Amino acid sequence: METTLAKTPEKRQVVFLAILLLLWEAGSEAIRYSIPEETESGYLVAHLAKDLGFRVGELATRRARIHHRGNKELLQLDVETGNLLLKEKPDREALCGATEPCVLHFQIILENPVQFFQTELQLTDINDHSPEFPDTEMLLKIQESTQPATVFLLKAAQDSDIGSNAVQNYTVSPNLHFHVVTLSRSDGRKYPELVLDRALDREEQPELTLILTALDGGAPPKSGTTTVRIEVVDINDNAPEFVQSLYSVEVPENSPLDALVVTVSARDLDAGIHGNVAYSLFQGGGGPQPFVIDEITGEIRLKGALDFEATSYYTMEIVATDSGGLSGKCTVAIQVLDVNDNAPKLTISSLTSSIPENAPEAVVAVFSVSDPDSGDNGRMVCSIQNELPFLLKPTFENYYTLAAEGPLDREIREEYNITIIVSDLGTPRLTTQHTITVQVVDINDNAPAFTQTSYTMFVHENNNPALHIGTISATDSDSGSNAHITYSLLPPHDLQLSLASLVSINADNGQLFALRAMDYEALQAFEFHVVARDGGSPALSSQALVRVVVLDDNDNAPFILYPMQNASAPCTELLPRAAEPGYLVTKVVAVDSDSGQNAWLSFQLLKATEPGLFSVWAHNGEVRTTRLLSERDVPKHRLLLLVKDNGEPPRSASVTLHVLLVDGFSQPYLPLPEVQHDSSQDEDMLTLYLVIALASVSSLFLLSVLLFVGVRLCRRVREASLGACSVPEGHFSGHLVDVSGMGTLSQSYQYEVCLSGDSGTTDFKFLNHYSQ
């Protein structure tokens, strides 16, 4: 049915109402925003919801959308906050070229109910382009007879910027013969002319080189330079003159390449080689043009395709130069004629591929039609099939809404293929078709169901970040978007658990990933809930419990608590030479932060100064002697012990133990727990020890008395003769017996030795302490 050709009175009323709506919309002022070009993406252009008079969130409720004219989508609308943001960095020169002002039109489309707002974005120019000359060098041939104040045409620099940021001034390097003046064309573009100040003398200087500089009006200004090379030639006193100063021509946009556009003609009154004229296109600041000129005949032909929709009018200057360097110019104005070479374009702004069967007059699509041609070539009509229960409703400015006539019945038909036909009124007519498939679906009455009520997943500590540890799966009995399930994590009940830093879930397939390496020593397990939510409206959801168990890895080496390793003061253990086999020298104490078999420690003696003298118990770290010490054993021993855990692979730590053999060191002897003592043998040994102790005490007492008397006598003799007793000097070995008879103890201490006859042990006990 064609909406523009309605015949019945009812359709006339619809058309009349549509025209009123179009007039109302056209009369409403568009909201205009302005930003500088090259503004970074993400820039906040405006709070659109506030400017349109809506509350925050109302744009999302009404399913607001933004539609751009053209292919560039520079803006994006955050419907939740109502903010209008830049989607990408805009380039004014790429979007508008030399057009000023640069205004981009777009529409804000709201559904439920449908409403349109005309909005414009103006891009202001910034000085982001430097002037550029078309050539790095310009050659001028000037006769030596040229009079001062003669003007020579120079090629203008091109600057993509506009306004004050475009080229504003030209300067030339200091010289004695020329200065440059800056002039304006009818379109406002600046161009330079070189003015002769002082007559040239070819015999004095046959060639000059000048630097021409173009400056724009930016702050700070940008510049571009080119070299002007001047050849001084013999006299040529007539410049070429064109038959017409202005050539106007019309060219259809579908003209083939190399088609003749126009022929220009110039003549030179000079004779000989000075009368030969060469034609060339004078490149101004407007950029390259799709034309080429024959330098001999003056024929201007088409070298590139024309497009009325892109550029409808060209203006260029033709320069005729004789062999003496004199030149003349004319202007060629070319009007491009439009032909019907563009089919209508249909742009879908909003599309709903499925409609609930209970939705009355549901909107299926909002679209716009456009045709860049002009006149009847750009006028369009739009229609759909007659037998379908859908209507096309024109809104404004070539916008249409495709909606259902009333509630649909899924049981009668669950799918519709709607073909939208758009035709222009040109000759011949060009047509565009677009087919939309609409599904009629049930309402959302089934919540997602997990395959398990709870999930347990295991991950080894020290895992790689982004490791896939498992998959959560749910199904939904609905169809279409109602069955599209998205997964998300619920905040944990334990506020101390930073779940967002531990795991993440793929919203589409439920795959769980560990975001960082787990540490069993810090966290052994944690729980959280996963939500599966379908895409219905309103959405239905369900939850499942997930428990992640961290498995311990052997990532901690044993740590030795004792003996402490200190390079400045190494640990030294004292061992009496009279120690029996199995004597406890020391005990190595170590811990492991891991758990299970990764924390089971074993001890091993790797290296010793005297192999076979010491041994270490593998499970408790006790270092004991394995035999009796002899006089041949060195006094200092160095033991290297290894502490190893039971992990895979095992980790270990080593400790160095220094053992010093000493004489007369009294320390309780700790027997091996395995040794079984014979009670009768202990009683015999006890009696023997008692006898030896009494004899030793008596001998020491007698020796002490004798020494005391000898010392007293020596003092008396010394006092009588010299008044002093000389003491021999020299080093006494530390292992020699003390001649005072006091042993290794100081003279100020004595100990009472007691043997218990009924204790059943041979250990000595130190009971009383006496001071002399």
Swiss-Prot record:
Residues 31-133, 134-242, 243-346, 347-450, 451-560, 575-675 form the Cadherin domain. Changing S323R: Changed homophilic interaction, being unable to interact with the wild-type protein but able to bind itself. Coiled coil: none annotated. Changing L326F: No effect on homophilic interaction. Changed homophilic interaction. Residues 712-772 are cytoplasmic. Glycans are attached at N169, S223, T225, N417, N566. GO terms for molecular function: calcium ion binding; identical protein binding. It is found in: Cell membrane. Residues 1-28 form the signal peptide. Changing E317K: Changed homophilic interaction, being unable to interact with the wild-type protein but able to bind itself. The chain crosses the membrane at residues 691-711. Changing Q143P: Changed homophilic interaction. GO terms for biological process: cell-cell recognition; homophilic cell adhesion via plasma membrane adhesion molecules. Pfam families: Cadherin, Cadherin_2, Cadherin_C_2. Keywords: Calcium, Cell adhesion, Cell membrane, Disulfide bond, Glycoprotein, Membrane, Metal-binding, Repeat, Signal, Transmembrane, Transmembrane helix. Disulfide bonds join C96-C102. It is a single-pass type I membrane protein. Residues 31-690 are extracellular. InterPro entries: Cadherin-like_dom, Cadherin-like_sf, Cadherin_C, Cadherin_CS, Cadherin_N, Protocadherin/Cadherin-CA. Forms homodimers in trans (molecules expressed by two different cells). Forms promiscuous heterodimers in cis (at the plasma membrane of the same cell) with other protocadherins. PANTHER family: CADHERIN-87A, PROTOCADHERIN BETA 4-RELATED. Calcium-dependent cell-adhesion protein involved in cells self-recognition and non-self discrimination. Thereby, it is involved in the establishment and maintenance of specific neuronal connections in the brain. Cadherin 1 to cadherin 4 domains mediate homophilic trans-interaction, the interaction with an identical protocadherin expressed by a neighboring cell. This is a head-to-tail interaction, the cadherin 1 domain interacting with the cadherin 4 domain and the cadherin 2 domain interacting the cadherin 3 domain of the other protocadherin. The cadherin 6 domain mediates promiscuous interactions with protocadherins on the same cell membrane. Each cadherin domain binds three calcium ions. This is Protocadherin beta-6. It comes from Mus musculus (Mouse).
